[in-house]
């Protein structure tokens, strides 16, 4: 008998394993990662706000990325921690919808924001004399606002379409959060139009920003090759290396999950990759942007007694 989506009051999240010992081990690992993410990103945001030396476009974007990663991780990890140690693996229909909406909105926003950072790096390296004028605080704020608006507008579209399906099968989600592909597996009805829309949103929100990032780095490489001194060359490379590492890890994870042909898709492998970009990546992003950064280290020394 079919059940329409309004009769589904909750979903069951299978998570990673049913073994109690392994669940406890995962709880400890995820708690440690989440604690580092919260403390580290919060500290970085405070440093950027308090230290005038960090009041530059580059650190403005870094601070916003830290805020986004902090928010992004908080959408998933608290529920994952509860699921690991609780007998109750359920999530309400409204809770699943909210988790889906915010996760999609923040994921899309990060794609746009990473593209904005790439543009900032391009201007800093290719047009250093015009950098302060070109990357004004108004433009930086506008780029961040557009990133969030674009992300959440598109998230509203895909959330509405996804949760308008009739969930006529079991309400068991083979994942640790309310992700797109496991939810679509539970839905019944014609999905052809939905899949077209899904891949259109993937192209417009993920592929297009990736193309902009690639174009920015092609221009950056062209500019770097014109630098005669090895010191200037290394400085330009170090300016971009952290961002390029972050982009590669983030886009690689997303494209692996959502862009692979359906026949090669594995829910078990998806769980591992999803864990990386939802839980681990926000912590890695913090390390990538701050641990090797001399300005951040100096600001931290000033803050600590």
Swiss-Prot record:
A GO MF label: olfactory receptor activity
Entry keywords, A to Z: Cell membrane, Disulfide bond, G-protein coupled receptor, Glycoprotein, Membrane, Olfaction, Receptor, Sensory transduction, Transducer, Transmembrane, Transmembrane helix
Membrane disposition: Multi-pass membrane protein
Record topology, Extracellular segments: 1-24, 75-98, 160-196, 258-270
Tree of life domain: Eukaryota
InterPro entries on file: GPCR_Rhodpsn, GPCR_Rhodpsn_7TM, Olfact_rcpt
Membrane side Cytoplasmic: residue ranges: 46-53, 120-138, 217-236, 292-305
UniProt keyword annotation of Signal present: no
Cellular component aspect of the GO annotation: plasma membrane
Pfam families: 7tm_4 (PF13853)
SUPFAM superfamilies (UniProt xref): Family A G protein-coupled receptor-like
PROSITE patterns, sorted: G_PROTEIN_RECEP_F1_1 (PS00237), G_PROTEIN_RECEP_F1_2 (PS50262)
Transmembrane residue ranges: 25-45, 54-74, 99-119, 139-159, 197-216, 237-257, 271-291
Similarity annotation: Belongs to the G-protein coupled receptor 1 family.
Protein name listed in UniProt: Olfactory receptor 9G1
Organism from which the protein derives: Homo sapiens (Human)
Taxonomic lineage of the native organism: Eukaryota, Metazoa, Chordata, Craniata, Vertebrata
């Amino acid at each position: 008998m079919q059940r329409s989506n309004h009769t589904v009051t909750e979903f069951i999240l299978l998570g990673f394993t049913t073994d109690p010992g392994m669940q406890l081990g995962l709880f400890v690992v995820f708690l440690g990662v989440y604690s580092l993410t919260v403390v580290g990103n919060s500290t970085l945001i405070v440093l950027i706000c308090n230290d005038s030396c960090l009041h530059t476009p580059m650190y403005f974007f870094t601070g916003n990325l830290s805020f986004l990663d902090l928010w992004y991780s908080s959408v998933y990890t608290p529920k994952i921690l509860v699921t690991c140690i609780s007998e109750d693996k359920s999530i309400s229909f409204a809770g699943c919808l909210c988790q889906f909406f915010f996760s999609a909105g923040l994921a899309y926003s990060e794609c746009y924001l990473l593209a904005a950072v790439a543009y900032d790096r391009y201007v800093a390296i290719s047009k250093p004399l015009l950098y302060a004028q070109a990357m004004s605080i108004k433009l930086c704020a506008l780029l961040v606002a557009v990133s969030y608006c674009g992300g959440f507008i598109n998230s509203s579209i895909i959330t509405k379409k996804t949760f308008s399906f009739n969930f006529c099968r079991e309400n068991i989600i083979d994942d640790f959060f309310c992700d797109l592909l496991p939810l679509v597996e539970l839905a019944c009805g014609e999905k052809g139009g939905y899949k077209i829309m899904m891949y259109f949103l993937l192209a417009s929100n993920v592929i297009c920003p990736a193309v902009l990032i690639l174009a920015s780095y092609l221009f950056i490489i062209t500019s770097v090759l014109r630098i005669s001194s090895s010191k200037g060359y290394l400085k330009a490379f170090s300016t971009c290396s952290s961002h390029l590492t972050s982009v590669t890890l983030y886009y690689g994870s997303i494209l692996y999950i959502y862009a692979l042909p359906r026949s090669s898709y594995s829910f078990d492998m998806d769980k591992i990759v999803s864990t990386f970009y939802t839980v681990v990546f926000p912590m890695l992003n913090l390390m990538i942007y701050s641990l090797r950064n001399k300005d951040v280290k100096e600001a931290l020394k000033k803050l600590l007694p």
